[in-house]
Structure formats: C-alpha cells, structure tokens
C-alpha cells in the first residue's frame, strides 16, 4: 500500500465494542481496541492515501446466532428497530463500499451495520 501510495484497510469490530455485554468483557475490550487502533492508524496514514475504517456489525444470522436461545433471540430482535437480524450480505456490502473508490474521502470511521440497534440501544434500558 505504501509502495502504491494508496490503499484501504477495513477492520471488523462489533456492536459489543460500543455497548458491552454481560460475560463478554474480554470480547468487548478486544473489539473496542480494534476501533482505537484503526483510528490511530487512520490519522497516521491519511496523508499516504491509505484509508482505514471499521465495520461494526450487530446481530447477524450466523452459526453463532443460530445457537442463541429462541426466547433470548426474540428479545434481541425486539430491540432492533428494523425488526430482524442482519444477513452476511449486509456486512459484506458495507465492506465492499469501504473498499471501493466511493469511500475515498472516508477514513477513521466506524460504520454500524445493525438495523438501528446501536442507535436505539440506550433508550431501551431507560424504558
């Protein structure tokens, strides 16, 4: 990338980096660390035309979420404004956008792909 004087780095984090989760302090810390790492590198490499961003998925239909208890899964979905779990394509489409020329002026950012869950998260705990 340095040799080519351009490039894109896209790191994958998690909604848990922003919200925390019971029993997942280590996971939340590691994902939050990726965000700080990415922002620091984005500042360092911006003038070298290397863009560094994060994608922060929420609950996406995967083998991992298939193992979630159905009652808990219904509760999670009720907290997502879009009313559904995301698909892998939702995340990959965001990554494709960040890898494309359409995102040349975007660096040091985290894009949330979670059906609005992060946006609405705090208000659910108040109600």
Residue ranges and their predicted role:
Residues 14:
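Residue(s) in the substrate-gating loop at a strand-loop-helix junction
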Residues 18, 35, 53-67:
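Short, flexible catalytic-loop segment of classical short-chain dehydrogenase/reductase
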Residues 19, 96, 107-127:
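Short C-terminal tail/terminal secondary-structure segment
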Residues 20-24, 46, 122:
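Active-site "substrate specificity/gating" loop of NAD(P)-dependent dehydrogenases
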Residues 30, 38:
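Active-site helix of classical SDR
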Residues 43-47, 104:
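Alpha-helical segment proximal to the catalytic Tyr-Lys
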Residues 47, 59-80, 120-127:
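A glycine/serine/threonine-rich, flexible loop-to-helix segment
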Residues 54, 77-102, 106, 115:
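C-terminal helical subdomain
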């Amino acid at each position: 990338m340095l040799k080519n004087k351009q490039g894109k780095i896209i790191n994958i984090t998690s909604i848990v980096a922003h919200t925390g989760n019971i029993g997942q302090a280590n996971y939340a810390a590691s994902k939050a660390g990726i965000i700080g790492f990415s922002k620091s590198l984005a500042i360092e490499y911006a003038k070298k035309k290397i863009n560094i961003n994060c994608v922060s998925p929420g609950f996406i239909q995967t083998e991992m979420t298939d193992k979630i208890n159905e009652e808990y899964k219904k509760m999670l979905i009720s907290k997502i404004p879009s009313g559904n779990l995301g698909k892998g394509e939702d995340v990959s489409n965001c990554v494709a956008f960040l890898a494309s020329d359409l995102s040349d002026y975007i660096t040091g950012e985290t894009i949330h792909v979670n059906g609005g869950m992060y946006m609405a998260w705090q208000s659910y705990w108040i109600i």
